[in-house]
C-alpha cells in the first residue's frame, strides 16, 4: 500500500505542484529500510513531502 503525506508551508494551492517541479530545486532523498520499505523525501522552503512505498 502506498501512502503520501504532504505538508505545505505556504499556501494550500502550492501543493498542487508535482514532485517533478520540486526535484531539481530541493533535496531529493531515497532510502531503503531493511524490511524493503522505500522512502522518498523532498524538502525545500516551500514544501516538505514524504512518500513511503512498501513492498508487498
Label each region the model flagged:
Residues 1-37:
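Structured alpha/beta or helical-core interaction and ligand-binding surfaces enriched in interleaved
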Amino acid at each position: 500500500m502506498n501512502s503520501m503525506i504532504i505538508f505545505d508551508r505556504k499556501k494550500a494551492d502550492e501543493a498542487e505542484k508535482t514532485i517533478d517541479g520540486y526535484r531539481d530545486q530541493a533535496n531529493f532523498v531515497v532510502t531503503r529500510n531493511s524490511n524493503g520499505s522505500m522512502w522518498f523525501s523532498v524538502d525545500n522552503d516551500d514544501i516538505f513531502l514524504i512518500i513511503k512505498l512498501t513492498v508487498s
